[in-house]
């Protein structure tokens, strides 16, 4: 629409989820959705005439801590309550077209502005319940597993250009970068140390839920769990 070479491919990584409550994300359309009826109800909700019946049209997908839900551009989505989500996005500041704002009002007492015209044009209507479960839910694959290390590819979808690898470690592990920048987030454990293999940068510590960047020029680096605990580090890169 805006003549860009890329779109807002993203994903939700569940940093945490309430174990005593229902936890979910909204993802993809239900089977047999009537496009015209959905648009009619969205426009009525935009005017504040009625509340949009989300669960009539959008799948409510159960999730738990450490699930990774993939969201290729054009997929209807929203995070759910009782969850803490790490959003990994190719374009975190553009291309978000809101279809409904959950009835929230602006300072003028009217529903806040949304992007319904653009949003309706960008929905991929074939991404229904079956497509969601076949392609973007539960896609984690183990790449390597030893006594002190498990390496898993958790995403992203084949249509997307960002790859995500999760390292579950109880000891030091060396990571090769394949000439691409690494953006990492500690998703389990209190802290981990990132060390240079050749002294090209000073070692630094990443704490829980913090994000750090290792430039592509580094080549290889080492992740070291601190305080003798098991950690999980999620690393995103451009593939």
Residue ranges and their predicted role:
Residues 1-65, 80-190, 194-198, 203-204, ...:
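Active-site region of the double-stranded beta-helix
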């Amino acid at each position: 629409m805006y003549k860009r070479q890329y779109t807002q491919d993203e994903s939700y990584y569940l940093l945490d989820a309430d174990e005593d409550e229902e936890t979910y994300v909204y993802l993809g359309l239900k089977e047999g959705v009537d496009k015209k009826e959905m648009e009619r109800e969205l426009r009525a909700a935009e005017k504040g005439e009625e509340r949009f019946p989300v669960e009539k049209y959008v799948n409510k997908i159960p999730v738990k801590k450490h699930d990774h839900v993939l969201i290729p551009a054009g997929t209807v989505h929203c995070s759910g309550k009782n969850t803490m989500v790490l959003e990994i996005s190719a374009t975190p500041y553009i291309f978000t077209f809101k279809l409904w704002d959950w009835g929230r009002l602006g300072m003028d007492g009217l529903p806040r502005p949304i992007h319904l015209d653009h949003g309706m044009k960008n929905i991929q209507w074939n991404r229904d319940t079956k497509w969601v479960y076949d392609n973007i839910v539960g896609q984690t694959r183990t790449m390597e597993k030893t006594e002190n290390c498990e390496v898993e590819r958790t995403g992203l979808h084949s249509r997307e250009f960002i790859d995500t690898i999760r390292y579950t470690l109880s000891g030091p592990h060396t990571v090769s970068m394949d000439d691409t920048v690494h953006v990492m987030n500690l998703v389990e454990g209190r802290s981990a140390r990132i060390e240079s293999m050749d002294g090209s940068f000073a070692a630094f510590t990443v704490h829980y839920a913090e994000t750090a960047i290792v430039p592509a020029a580094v080549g290889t680096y080492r992740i070291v769990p601190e305080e003798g605990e098991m950690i999980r580090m999620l690393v995103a890169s451009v593939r």
